[in-house]
């Protein structure tokens, strides 16, 4: 990996990326309301479970396959698999989340003119667009490899979940850093598992997350949009 590719992925994983990630907790706030999260240890366990049991089986391998589609510019597969992922979201708010963040990242890619004109036209044609599809486009535009792309995406997800826990539980900054450090190895394992997952084995089935997310839509007091 070149320094330029590394910096591009650090940019994509940064919480400063203007796609609205900070406003979503992806079920963490509902888990807190259901008393599944009570403190730093239970927050760490919840985030670890989301990484190893949900992302590693679904979102990360999907991202890897979409990266390959962008690299070969397989427009038919890109559109079909993007539509499948959007339809697979477990609740209305999780669907809105991936659509809003995907749209925001796609707009950023277009505004910064990342990628060639033909691929930018394909990107613009995908509506709604899932976040992993847009993230894969941005990574492909910077010639990033699959392993580094998935690691950046997973780290960004862990960091955002930890940030949500800091606000909602609440936790202190040191507790948040301990969670991130504790999950470094889990990120590596999730990436390796995702890279070994063929397209027909991508699995987004997450019933507990779906139920919690649906409950969150009518939760009395909320900080986050999911």
Swiss-Prot record:
Recorded GO CC terms: cytoplasm
Residues spanning the membrane: none
Keywords from the named record: Chaperone, Cytoplasm, Nickel insertion
Stored Pfam families: UreF
UniProt-annotated location(s): Cytoplasm
Function: Required for maturation of urease via the functional incorporation of the urease nickel metallocenter.
Similarity comment: family membership: Belongs to the UreF family.
Subunit structure: UreD, UreF and UreG form a complex that acts as a GTP-hydrolysis-dependent molecular chaperone, activating the urease apoprotein by helping to assemble the nickel containing metallocenter of UreC. The UreE protein probably delivers the nickel.
PANTHER family named among the record's database cross-references: UREASE ACCESSORY PROTEIN F
Protein's name in the database: Urease accessory protein UreF
Source organism (scientific name): Burkholderia cenocepacia (strain HI2424)
Gene name of the encoded protein: ureF
């Amino acid at each position: 990996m070149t320094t330029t590719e590394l910096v591009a992925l650090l940019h994509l994983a940064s919480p400063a990326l203007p796609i609205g990630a900070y406003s979503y907790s992806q079920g963490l706030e509902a888990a807190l309301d259901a008393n599944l999260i009570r403190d730093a240890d239970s927050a760490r366990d919840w985030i670890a479970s989301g990484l190893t049991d949900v992302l590693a089986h679904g979102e990360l391998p999907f991202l890897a396959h979409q990266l390959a589609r962008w690299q070969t510019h397989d427009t038919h597969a890109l559109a079909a698999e993007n539509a499948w992922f959007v339809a697979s979201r477990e609740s209305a708010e999780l669907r809105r989340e991936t659509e809003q963040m995907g749209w925001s990242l796609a707009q950023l890619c277009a505004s910064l003119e990342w990628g060639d004109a033909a691929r930018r036209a394909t990107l613009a044609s995908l509506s709604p667009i899932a976040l992993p599809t847009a993230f894969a486009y941005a990574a492909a535009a910077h010639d990033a490899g699959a392993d580094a792309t998935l690691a950046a995406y997973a780290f960004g997800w862990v960091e955002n979940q930890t940030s949500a826990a800091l606000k909602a539980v609440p936790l202190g900054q040191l507790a948040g850093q301990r969670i991130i450090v504790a999950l470094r190895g889990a990120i590596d394992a999730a990436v390796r598992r995702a890279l070994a997952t063929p397209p027909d084995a991508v699995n987004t089935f997450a019933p507990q997350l779906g139920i919690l997310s649906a409950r969150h839509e009518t939760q009395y007091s909320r900080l986050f949009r999911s």
